[in-house]
Design a protein with these regions (language model features):
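Iron-sulfur (Fe-S) cluster-binding modules
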Residues: 93-108
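Sparse recognition of residues in long alpha-helices and their boundaries
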Residues: 22-23, 73, 100
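Short C-terminal domain-edge/linker segments immediately following a structured domain
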Residues: 31-34, 41-43, 85-89, 96-99
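Phenylalanine-focused residue identity feature
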Residues: 9, 14, 78, 105-106
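Cysteine-cluster motifs in flexible loop/terminal segments that predominantly coordinate metals
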Residues: 48-97
């Protein structure tokens, strides 16, 4: 949970949307409990909703990528984090994926 300069609670301190109240109207504990029960937060916590590389990554349960960055750059909160350069093991072992990456890397 993040608290902005004007006292708004947000699900992430970097995300402009998803306001869940303000310190003037709501205690932090109440905001936290409401966030834990919100449909969006429950969907975000279910790692099976995460797409792309982050969705198949062996570290998804402890990382999952930055959802705010994913939404900012891709328009989709559940897409892979574009700033992560890690290639999950399942993709490193996929010859088709490796060939696509080679083609992208060396295209002229």
């Amino acid at each position: 949970i993040g608290i902005t300069e004007n006292g708004d609670y947000r699900s992430c301190g970097f995300h402009e949307g998803y306001r869940i109240g303000n310190v003037k109207d709501k205690k932090l504990r109440t905001a936290w409990e409401e966030l834990q029960k919100s449909p969006l937060h429950l969907k975000l916590r279910d790692k099976s909703n995460i797409k792309g590389r982050c969705g198949v990554c062996e570290y998804s349960e402890i990382c999952g990528g930055c959802r705010t960055r994913a939404e900012y750059y891709t328009g989709d909160l559940f897409e892979s984090d574009p700033a992560c350069n890690y290639i999950p093991k399942v993709l490193r072992e996929d010859p088709k994926y490796l060939e696509r990456m080679r083609e992208e890397l060396y295209k002229k």
